Amino acid sequence: MSQPFRSADIRQAFIDFFISKQHTPVASSSLIPHNDPTLLFTNAGMNQFKETFLGMEPRDYTRAVTSQKCVRAGGKHNDLDNVGYTARHHTFFEMLGNFSFGDYFKQAGIGYIWEFLTSDEWLAIDKNRLYVTIYETDDEAFDIWHKDIGIPSERIIRIGDNKGAPYASDNFWTMGDTGPCGPCTEVFYDHGADIEGGLPGTPEEDGDRYIEIWNCVFMQFNRQKDGTMLPLPAPSVDTGMGLERISAIMQGVHGNYEIDLFVHLMDAAAEILEIENQQQSSLKVIADHIRAVSFLIADGVTPSNEGRGYVLRRVIRRAVRHGNKLGADSDFFYKMVAPLVAEMGIAYPELKDKQSVIENTIQKEEAQFAKTLAQGLRLLASELEGLQDGDTLSGEAAFKLYDTYGFPVDLTADITRERGIVIDEAEFDEHMQAQRERARDAGKFDVDYSSVIQVENPTTFIGYEQLEQEGVAIDALYQDGNPADSLTEGMEGVVVLDRTPFYAEGGGQVGELGEIRTATGVFDVQDTKKSGQAIIHYGVVTMGEIKTKQTADAQVLSSIRAASAKNHSATHLLHAALREVLGDAVTQKGSLVSSEVLRFDFSYDKPVSPAEIMRIERLVNEQIQANTPTRIENMPIDEAIKQGAMALFGEKYGNDVRVLTMGTDSIVDGQRMPFSIELCGGLHVQRTGDIGVLKITSESGIAAGIRRIEAVTAMNAIKNIQQSEQQLSELASQLKVKRPEVAQRVRTMADKQRDLEKQLERLEQKIASAQAANLLDEVQTIAGIPLLISTLSGVDGKSIRTLMDDIKSKLPDSVIVLIGDKDEQLALAANVAKSVTDRIKAGDIIRYLAGELGGKGGGKPDYAQGGAPKSNNSAAVIAALPAWVAAQLS
């Protein structure tokens, strides 16, 4: 391989090498794992091949090569806290991998590694700098490395079970508690004696001298929940080499952040922030985080308060805080997207395609956090006053930063870490308990059935042609996650058939319902899902007993099938109408299709107006009224895309796909195009008229840049329209007008109410002014400072602020606390003259008072406000306030 060794060149060289070894290049899968509920994010190259390794998803190739996008932030695999503090931790990284599915095994796998690393045609790394590790009992791997490759035995290190359990070893790889696993061999590069660190397996192994660059897993087993190791259908190979690490070696540097890719991003960050790039930790954080954030957004993740969206929010806010640390006083992080696209957009075109979406999403989140960042940092600074290296910040303070200022706890920990201070996490967790359901919970993902379901042949779906089938075979039964020979009356379980008319949940459509009958029992199917190549029927035995290997009759509930098909077809028409009205930037983000309702989530950065909703609804119903036949064809995916069929980004498709065409044709760019053409494996109507009618029932925002439309069809739409008509008639009757006059009458009433509210506000201000006239008589002097504390009846927060402005002009160098008492609520406000804020702060007064009253509040040193519910002890708390203020002033 010729110089220079750019990261992009190394990525391409890896792919080219394995193509020359008859490997099929496979595109990186989405960072959102497909059909794998055990993973928060894709974190290894083998994730997309998991079911292939299990023998449940055959492919038309047995060798593959990939450059896989990976994220390790949140969940079990989490490197977020270390980014910026080490030379090699990242939230996002690229994993170069080659895979064998029952093809070659250890001999060829090891040989390919050595050839690519050391051959003059490829990387030409000095062989004397390479060490390898193997699993302690893997004599076969030892012989290949020593006898065939020629590595001296002293550079081959055996690693046993060093993690406290059988098969718990650095050289026995597992994907999780269950799933594919096996012994592995790892290649290490020696950076030289001038770098601290020891060989793998020694106490000094965590140093930077010997760095792992390639891990080759010999996939032989499928670990069960009870720890049993079952042989995989065919021994396979799964390898991974971090692009960032191998780039550091090829570019002659010791740390990943010194390679071309990161240097360019750090230079861009320094230019945006108008500082010099001196390899500051904060620049490393920004360069790393823009990669994770941009790729996550491109793959459909949006900031939120739970799950993947909360991890994204944490990463963005951590980057923003580090920019603030470097002097950023305005939004900056979104400006890093363009340099990233320039650096990685060729290898990953989705970055270029989604650039504006990524920038807008980041900028909105950045602007939202900016509103509270400065306040939160001030609060944290005050909490850290007096704490020293080794001390502990209270969990209560960390929770307040999270709850009030939007600081994820790991962001607070990141800041305190710089001063050697830790957080009382146990106390923080206690405060979080009340909000646990809304907060991030990386452990919320379900048990993975792919590690449980074991069938010899994939289930054949026959439901496109029929609703029922006699003479199907029960291939397997499961109860409580374990294989069963039979299920008896009242038992819940899972049934796997050799053939089934039941549609399994997919493409947004829910799984079907119905019955499976045998000669000895009846199984009520309550849901249908996929697990690898098996279709699994969830339900309960309602009569008798069913057994494995029995012959059965399977029947889908026809009314549910028909209603679901109408809603699914309507969803396609809705998608096309949205793109026509709102523009081609609209992309599907999710959907739910049941027999009762359809729900469609899509990317759009503002609410859809009522006029747009009406136009979208009208377009869909025009297509329904046209009553054109739907057309379903199977074709190669390349041909489908060429015809204009829309594919969902991140969805996994085979070489042959099912294409659904609906609606009347129109001419687009000189080419005849149908109203809707999409890839879809779901169930649909035969003609658009079968849908009947569509009625949009709601439109709302569910996350930054994501909108949701809900709608109903057929009789459910008729019912919705009739209910609306009835409500309108009742409203007209109450208002004593005709139905067409309801809107005008409501507008007139609203105008009148606004006028009355303004009159009431003016009256309240007069009452407040009348009460305030004598307030100066209540002033007392404490420690030489004029102090006024007064409660005003019938006065709200807005009037309190107006009064405060008036009184503080008449009472300089003072402390003023006003409490408005109206409608069982207390409005709190405090003003402290700037000349006095070195002795007492308004924010402290309000925090104390609100806390004692059971409310919330805070603010600046000179002005703060809050609120609290009125209670029986409110008067006593307020009466005690002068003494508290006096104590602070003394």
From Swiss-Prot:
Species: Psychrobacter arcticus (strain DSM 17307 / VKM B-2377 / 273-4)
EC number(s) on file: 6.1.1.7
Predominant localisation class: cytoplasm
Binding site for Zn(2+): H568, H572, C680, H684
Protein's UniProt name: Alanine--tRNA ligase
Keyword Ligase found: yes
Any one biological process term the GO annotation gives: negative regulation of DNA-templated transcription
An annotated GO cellular component: cytosol
Cofactor: Zn(2+)
SMART domains linked: tRNA_SAD
Free-text comment on the cofactor: Binds 1 zinc ion per subunit.
Domain remark text: Consists of three domains; the N-terminal catalytic domain, the editing domain and the C-terminal C-Ala domain. The editing domain removes incorrectly charged amino acids, while the C-Ala domain, along with tRNA(Ala), serves as a bridge to cooperatively bring together the editing and aminoacylation centers thus stimulating deacylation of misacylated tRNAs.
The organism's taxonomic lineage, starting at the top: Bacteria, Pseudomonadati, Pseudomonadota, Gammaproteobacteria, Moraxellales
Annotated InterPro entries: aa-tRNA-synth_II/BPL/LPL, Ala-tRNA-lgiase_IIc, Ala-tRNA-ligase_IIc_anticod-bd, Ala-tRNA-synth_IIc_core, Ala-tRNA-synth_IIc_N, Ala-tRNA_ligase, Ala_tRNA_ligase_euk/bac, DHHA1_dom
Gene: alaS
Keyword tags: Aminoacyl-tRNA synthetase, ATP-binding, Cytoplasm, Ligase, Metal-binding, Nucleotide-binding, Protein biosynthesis, RNA-binding, tRNA-binding, Zinc
CDD domains (UniProt xref): AlaRS_core
Catalytic activity field: tRNA(Ala) + L-alanine + ATP = L-alanyl-tRNA(Ala) + AMP + diphosphate
Top-level EC class: ligase
Annotated function: Catalyzes the attachment of alanine to tRNA(Ala) in a two-step reaction: alanine is first activated by ATP to form Ala-AMP and then transferred to the acceptor end of tRNA(Ala). Also edits incorrectly charged Ser-tRNA(Ala) and Gly-tRNA(Ala) via its editing domain.
GO molecular function per UniProt: alanine-tRNA ligase activity; aminoacyl-tRNA deacylase activity; ATP binding; tRNA binding; zinc ion binding
Family: Belongs to the class-II aminoacyl-tRNA synthetase family.
Localization: Cytoplasm
